Structures are given as C-alpha cells and as structure tokens.
Amino acid sequence: MNLFSSVQLAPKDPIFGLTEAYTADQRPGKVNLGVGVYYTDDGKVPLLRAVLEAEKEVVAKEAPRAYIPIEGPNPYNSAVQNLLFGKDSALIQAGRVVTAECLGGTGALRVGGDFVKRLEPNSQAAISSPSWENHRGIFEAAGYTVLDYAYFDPKTRGVDFDGMVKSLQSFPAKTLVILHACCHNPTGADLTKDQWKTIISICQQKQLIPFLDIAYQGFADGIEEDGAAVRMFADSGMSFFVSSSFSKSFSLYGERVGALSIVTQNKEESARVLSQLKRVIRTNYSNPPTHGAAIVATVLNSPKLRQMWEDELAQMRDRIKSMRHGLKEKLAAAGISHDFSFIEAQRGMFSYSGLTADQVAKLQEQDAIYALSTGRICVAALNSKNIDRVAQAIARVLMSK
C-alpha cells in the first residue's frame, strides 16, 4: 500500500509562494512588494534597539527553559491587556479580560475560532471583501462556513460603508465577524470613529460576535490612536475577541509573538472562559514558547524601553508615510491621468494599488518587481533606492494597452 499515492500537490501560498519566486530570481534590482514585512531604507528587516536591550536583559537572567502556563506568562498577558485597553481600564480592574499568549496573530485567530466553534457549533464566520489571504483558510480549517461582507469600494479606493452595513445586517445571530481594528489588510482603508459606532450598534442589535484583528497597532497614527476601535468595543459593554500580533510592531516576525484577549461580562465568567480556553490550547500546542513573549513583556513593562520602542515605531510609521507620499508624487509626475491621492490616504503597511493581475504579472516579468495578483503592494518595502524604479515600472504598465 502506498499511503501517499492520492496526495495532491497543494497550491503555493499566495504570499510565501511569491517570496520563493522572488528569492529564485537572479535579476539585479529585484523588489519584493508582496510580503508584509517592514524594511529599513537599506532594505533590511530592522532589529529594534528596544528589542535588543530587552533581549540582553532576558538572556542575562539565565532562566531555565521550563514549561510556562498554558495561557502564557502573566507579565506578558498583563502587558498585552494594558496596551490594548489602557493600564487604567475598568475592564481590566474588574477582571473582565482574559488573555492568552498565542503563536502570532494567526495562532490567536485560530485559537479564538476553535473556542467559539466549541461554544457555538453552528456559528459561521464573516470576513471583509477583500481580506488578508489567510483569514478564510484559518476559519475554514476551524470548521466554519466563511461569509464575506462588503468593505472596499474600487471606485473611491476607500471603504464601502453602506455595503458593509447592509452585509452585517444580513448575517444571522452569533456570526463571528472578523474586523480589522486598524491598517486594514490589504486595502489600507480604515473606518472612522463614527463608522465604528455604527458597526458596534449593529453587532449589538444583530447579536453578532465581534473578533477584532489588530496586527499593526502603531503603524497608522500611534499606539493610542490605533487602539481606538478596541476601546470603543470595550466601552460598549459587549463581549468580544481581540487577536493581537507583535510581529510587525516589534520586528519579531520569526518569534511568533501574539495574543488572544477575550472580554467577558464579569470576573466569574472570566474564570470559566479561561478554563475552556486553556483546554483549546492544551489540545493544540499545549504551551506557548518563552523567548519572544519575554522580550515584549520586558519592553512594555519598562518605562525606558517602552519609550524607546514607541520612538522606533514612530520612525517606522513616518518612513512608510514618506514612501506613500513619494510614490504618489512620482506617479503623478510620470504624466498619468489617474488620481493617486488614495495612496497617501490609505494607512498602514499596504496599498491596494488598483493594478490588475495582468499588470502585476508584467511588473514581475519585465521588471523583477513582485506584488500580489490582487494589486496589494507593501509600501513598507519601498525605499529611497527602489522607489523611482518602482514608480516608473508602474507608470509604464498603467500606460500600456
């Protein structure tokens, strides 16, 4: 018997498969605008000074590599809660927030999805159209039927809010709705505070289950500003979920540092929720790793390192904004009649460029410039050395018949 004779070759991941093609490309001057990674102006993944200092402190302790609690270490989980909800949060003080360290934002989404599926076996999940490529796969793998809600208007390159409202109002009660808290991936189009108020009201009226995904806190306007949606949900009195990731904001991509936070109605409910959450984690990966979470906790719990980190994060944010402005200006200077103001208006690491799949293919074939077939480009991969070449190539494919 050949056990694996029926195994089919799986399609490559749209993002990491693109990176494989980019790595194999031997042409000089190649540019990878596909993967969601922040690069310095020298084209390198940064090692933040705050992270380096924290890691020195962690290593100096020479702590044994023993198992840590299923939900992760308390210093880390407390730091995550304070970052999301504020250190003076009434929810935290009332014991209404349960947090568990997870394997990146992806792990937090899956653990949260598994938890809800055990609680509500008939629940469906809903993601924005478009959304991060892995959202659909994560929740389908957790057993959900995945619905789509309207989000992006290709004409305005902004949020189709009327369509979003109509979609959410059509969903049955207990639908798990995945919401991008800031820096929407892939479009860069975010909701206003007034729009968030409407979404919260719909979730309450329709008894939807909000699941906020916040992977880019600090990349739009700042730590506090980018956490506004989470805190608005906190003020609503609803129970909800938050997936958070420190891959981007701490440049700790390979450490897989994330967290799942669940807001409950009271302290007693939190204890029951945590007990079941630990069961979900125990049968998945049992315990989380120590190193990445220890670094993040050390930074967030040290006033000096926290300020150093926020300063470095601000520098990353400002560089991305500078690249947005530069790309807009250079495309406009190329004499194309398009309105490129949307590039500067969009927020976070990505821009939904409007490039077609054929145009993206031409960029790859003719210029060794790699982007997703959806037209999503990572603005954080642009720098002073490649932005002219990228702008010229985009202008050429836009002008070609």
PLM regions: where:
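Hydrophobic beta-strand scaffold residues
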Residues: 33, 146, 210, 240, ...
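Active-site PLP attachment segment
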Residues: 229-272, 276
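Conserved core of the PLP fold type I
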Residues: 52, 57, 62-205, 218-219, ...
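Conserved Walker B
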Residues: 214-215
